[in-house]
Amino acid sequence: MAADRTGYIHDRRRLTAALLGPEAAPDPHPAPAHVVRGTLTDISPHMLGLATPEGERRFILTPQTTFWYGGECAPRELRPGQDVLLRCTPGAELVVERVWADLARATGVITAVDGDTVTVATGHDRAPVTAVIPYRASGRMRVRHPRLEPGYLFDAVGVRDGDTVRALIPATTQPPYPVVETPRRPPQHRSSAQVAGIASWYDPVRGQDTDTDPDGMLMGVAYPALDRTGDCGPACDRATPCAPLPLLSLGATVRVVNECTRVFAVLPVVACGAAASHFCDRCTVCDAPASGRIAELTLAAFVALGGQPESGCWSATLTVGGL
Amino acid sequence: MSETLQDVQLWILTAVLLLGAGTKAVDRTAQGPAVLLPVPLRRPFTVAHAAVEAGLAAGLLFCSGGAAYAVRGATAVLFAVGLVALVRLRQRDPEMGCGCFGGLSTEPIGWRALTRSGLFLAAAVATFGLPHSGWAALVHATPWHGVLCAAEVAVVAVLSPELREAVVRLRSPVPCELREVSRKQMVRRLHASREWHKQRPLLASPEPVDTWRHGCWWFARFAGQEGDREFSVVFAVEVGRRRPDVRSLVVEPPAE
């Protein structure tokens, strides 16, 4: 039955295009060759080995290669077995430009707080995340999240530490009210096929089995305006997003442009962005005025479009065809 | 003259309470004074508030004698408590709408909402001495009633930002790609279409195997069968138009 459903979802784009025209459901772009994810097997000053679902791969490190593991770090701080994401130099896919190790994120609504440990509900279709705020990050976390209490929003980027996320960098400025008291969004009277806002990221595999699971490199978006009557389901806990996003279902394709780098891709809707739908924040990365999260990209797609995962967002434009 | 004015208050209060109850019943999300309550109580409070308003409206229109005194007293109490709640809400959350007419009351509580609430409180108090019901007054209405009623409606309209909001919504409804629709509603529209009747003999079952949404279009996929040949019949139904455009397509399974 589940296989049937997956097959039906897979067919939706083809059938939508057949009835509304090809511009309604363009072909999704494949994963770019210059972004690679896997498990670190070995690292030396000049070479990096990675176990990926396609097999063992080796990459060249140069003096210009930068490393991130909770902050800028030296290559010797990385250890075999870590979940590693690489961005290589476009056109020279063996030369590494930047390396991120054990990236993780906790985005959603706080459900419990115990000292420096915060439990975050990340949406009806994802397991809750436990985030631990280390003492050295607590100051900057408190500035952007003044209310670490159940019911308030939380969004932080950090590194994976077993089953928990060590939250190091705040990725939003928390609204001063709990989610249930969010002011009602005024009804939208105007719409357009093109919506401006911000794009964030999530990890569809939560850093697990990136050497064998191809979903670690999944290119897609979790969409904050998934149709409630169909895919979002009876447990749907998404809010009405503050950007006027057209209602879509899983399998649709959208064109996402990173307004900071002007890189774009056509990506399929692969999940519900229930957590993102609560955020009506702005992105300071390239100072765009638009607010509201319009897409939560998979980690691979976010980096492929030129994003820095540690900054958490970029200004984006999302286009839906065939409306 | 004084009795004519009292009669008009009964009608105005009845109309206002009915409109308030109707708009709150349509949009049951907590607004206005309901947000002063704990979260689990907000929605039940909104429903109860709408029921009380509808009950009082019926009482104002049809009760006379002792029952009328009770209903008019309760109406005055309702508006007095409402006025206090609005002042309190304005202090706590200056951006919040009064919620007096459900989702239409989006403008932050200002002098207009407070004056209007005070006016309704005064109107409720003014009806205390009247021996007959609103309905009896309506049956024996005179041209003076009409003049006074029109003047008071004009005053209330000036004090009501909801009118502008209602006009905006009527003129430019929610665009079709943002409009939430129920599956039942879309199935009904599909069944009423010519395309459905044309393709119906091909369907193996009237229940869709998959449904999805793409902006202004809702799609339903059905299993189809003709002899040994199996295929799918897909319908696309436009959202938002009273007479929606419906398209259909017969799709052969992809070759193995």
Could you tell me what each predicted segment is?
Chain A
Residues 54, 124-126, 262:
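Glycine-centered tight beta-turn/hairpin loop motif at sheet-sheet or coil-to-beta transitions
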Residues 45, 55, 64-66, 115, ...:
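Disulfide-stabilized cysteine-rich extracellular repeat microdomains
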Residues 51, 121-123, 255-259:
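A generic structural motif
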Residues 32-33, 95-107:
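Short domain-boundary/entry signatures in modular proteins, especially
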Residues 48, 93-96, 118, 163-165:
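Hydrophobic residues embedded in beta-strands of well-ordered beta-sheets
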Residues 45-50, 115-121:
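Short aromatic-glycine-enriched beta-strand elements
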